Amino acid sequence: MLKFIQNNREATALLAIVCLFVFLGALDSQYLSVQTLTMVFSSAQILMLLAIGATMVMLTRNIDVSVGSTTGMCAVLLGVMLNAGYSLPVACLATLILGIVAGFFNGVLVAWLKIPAIVATLGTLGLYRGIMLLWTGGKWIEGLPAGLKQLSAPVFLGISAIGWFTLVLALLMAWLLAKTAFGRNFYATGDNLQGARQLGVRTEMVRIMAFSLNGGMAALAGIVFASQIGFIPNQTGTGLEMKAIAACVLGGISLLGGSGTVIGAILGAYFLTQIDSVLVLLRIPAWWNDFIAGLVLLGVLVFDGRLRCALQRNLRRQKYARFISPPTPLQAEAKTHAQQNKNKEVA
């Protein structure tokens, strides 16, 4: 059972989604509808994009806790440029470039300057959040053009243009990681850094690429955020980094690097967003969201750690079982007699 869960984390995440969907349907029959599925998917798009980016970084055995601030900073740039009169394509392109540059800077700190990823991205978390607040003066950005909001309007099967773009992007990244040398380099770097170098993989560039892609995904998440709500608060992106990491771990991405898929991360993001629906349906106050998200992250990490320990014990047992042969009947009988004689001597 444990081996099945470990080897089929995507199926496990999908099963969790179905079970939660059925549970909510039992509480309220109106929840069992296609409209509910698309509504949850629409709410999950930001987290899905961040989970795709986090997957790239975590596969290389790193972590990025600055993506929430990167998302907020990119959303602010988008709003500032749109309100300054720039066209939507130009503003979106500049936003995407800013996200990639922010991710590239993180990658340089980690790969070239050899700063631990958690330390480097904690620093840039504050840096990017500070830049965001300096741009806005601590104020919200409002009055965004209708063209931006139109990106999140349903176009087909109740899913917006941004929603379809997110699905296509997820499938593309899943294919790149699973079927190309480009993707295999990420797995090799995270699984065995020295071994990957001996095979000719440019591990520093792979890690910088991972952080850069992560920054690009954060920029896309900022665009989606602005298009969905129509304004940009000064706390945009706060706490999203923890949810992105939780979604990845829930979907089977290892914190030790080298294993997991984008599809699993997407399913993990959908499941976490579904939990928010539970809070709404059960009329639980919104300020419980962070507590629930932290609890889920902690639970997933504990479960993942215990699962790996159990599997390692099983592997060791199987590895050395052939060296430990069971005692023959004569050996067992001799051992019993020896124990009986020892007991008599003690008596």
Curated annotation (Swiss-Prot):
Q: Name one GO cellular component term.
A: plasma membrane
InterPro entries in alphabetical order: ABC_transp_permease
Could you list this entry's UniProt keywords, alphabetically sorted: Cell inner membrane, Cell membrane, Membrane, Transmembrane, Transmembrane helix, Transport
| One Pfam family from the record | BPD_transp_2
Please give the Gene Ontology molecular function terms for this protein.
Answer: transmembrane transporter activity
Its localization reads:
Cell inner membrane
Leader sequence residues:
none
> Subunit structure, briefly?
The complex is composed of two ATP-binding proteins (LsrA), two transmembrane proteins (LsrC and LsrD) and a solute-binding protein (LsrB).
The cross-references to PANTHER family, in alphabetical order and at most eight, read: ABC TRANSPORTER PERMEASE PROTEIN YPHD-RELATED-RELATED, AUTOINDUCER 2 IMPORT SYSTEM PERMEASE PROTEIN LSRC
The protein in question is named Autoinducer 2 import system permease protein LsrC
